[in-house]
């Protein structure tokens, strides 16, 4: 610290104030100190800084279902957003109920976290958050408008509306849905958006075939849909099930997109390499992570009330798996 002070031309007390984020430092002085820190590759002692500031610069994340694309991508987005500013301590649970959530909160608090982000993509995980200790800064991610605390999510309904409108705009008379588990909030909101898109066009929603997010579930749904001659367009609530639908359609002699159009949701890295490349709804997980982090920082500072925040927008990525219906 003394070397930094000499290079910046300030006292070691001023260096300490800059390192510990004290507000009463002139901008030019702060810039000079930060430049000296960078030049000397100075690394503050974390333990000493914690004793001075009572801050650990550590955040907790509670998650379950991290074997699924959505929760895993949310977790990665949060970790990327926090990199270089906060340490992230993760409690990954096989299932999230009130008891396990409370245990995870207590465990993370024991590690000195300043606040906690909960990835809560299902109705049961949202219910688990009811009655959490009020003094713990908590933010929920992935739960739409359902959480009883500060929350942010992707605009699932908006993405499904856009996909449905796109398929109808190509000339399809109806769009069938391969949905997700009934307990999934993402699946519920995407189904609601699909219904709204059909309703806007005056089209009655056909029965939904649900699956467990897997390619096999999509394949089984695709076999059922392939046997219905009127089916010309299918929206899947994730890309993995879309892959299964495409395979089933091909085996049934109904190739995509010349006979049946298929649109997915997520835009996983493999989507552009499907055969054909998949038209899908892209979720902005990096932005979701940044929003969640900003909300938690505000919550820690006492500047954020509970309630849902504006959702993170989606983008329809048009590739080659959807086309106008045959004449």
PLM regions with names:
Residues 228-327:
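Flexible loop/turn connectors
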Residues 14-17, 51-67, 166, 174-180:
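Short beta-strand segments enriched in small/hydrophobic residues
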Residues 1-57, 326:
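N-terminal helix-turn-helix DNA-binding module of bacterial transcription factors
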Residues 112-120, 176-178, 208-209, 229-238, ...:
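Periplasmic-binding protein-like
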Residues 58-165, 169:
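Alpha-helical recognition/docking segments in bacterial nutrient-uptake
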Residues 40, 110-112, 166, 170-171, ...:
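Glycine-rich phosphate-binding loop signature in dinucleotide/nucleotide-binding domains
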Residues 46, 64-73, 91-100, 143, ...:
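Hinge/beta->alpha junction and helix N-cap segments in small-molecule ligand-binding domains
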């Amino acid at each position: 610290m003394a070397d930094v002070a000499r290079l910046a031309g300030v006292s070691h007390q001023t260096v300490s104030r800059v390192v510990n984020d004290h507000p009463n430092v002139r901008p030019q002085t702060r810039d000079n100190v930060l430049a000296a820190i960078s030049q000397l590759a100075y690394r503050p002692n974390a333990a000493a800084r914690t004793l001075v500031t009572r801050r650990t610069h550590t955040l907790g994340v509670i998650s379950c279902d991290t074997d699924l694309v959505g929760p895993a991508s949310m977790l990665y987005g949060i970790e990327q957003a926090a990199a270089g500013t906060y340490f992230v301590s993760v409690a990954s649970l096989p299932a999230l109920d009130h008891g396990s959530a409370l245990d995870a909160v207590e465990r993370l608090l024991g590690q000195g976290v300043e606040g906690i982000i909960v990835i809560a993509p299902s109705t049961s995980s949202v219910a688990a958050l009811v009655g959490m200790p009020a003094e713990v800064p908590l933010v929920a991610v992935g739960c739409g408008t359902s959480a009883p605390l500060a929350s942010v999510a992707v605009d699932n309904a908006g993405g499904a509306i856009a996909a449905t409108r796109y398929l109808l705009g190509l000339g399809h008379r109806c769009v069938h849905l391969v949905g997700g588990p009934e307990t999934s909030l993402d699946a519920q909101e995407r189904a609601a958006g699909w219904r709204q898109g059909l309703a806007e066009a005056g089209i009655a929603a056909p029965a939904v075939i649900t699956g467990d997010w897997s390619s096999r579930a999509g394949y089984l749904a695709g076999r059922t849909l392939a046997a219905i001659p009127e089916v010309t367009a299918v929206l899947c609530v994730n890309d993995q099930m879309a892959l299964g639908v495409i395979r089933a359609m091909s085996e049934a002699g109904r190739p995509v997109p010349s006979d049946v159009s298929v649109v997915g949701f997520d835009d996983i890295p493999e989507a552009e390499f499907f055969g054909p490349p998949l038209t899908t709804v892209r979720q902005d997980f990096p932005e979701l992570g940044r929003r969640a982090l900003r909300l938690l920082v505000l919550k820690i500072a006492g500047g954020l009330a509970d309630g849902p925040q504006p959702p993170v927008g989606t983008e329809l990525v048009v590739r080659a798996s959807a086309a106008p219906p045959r004449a």
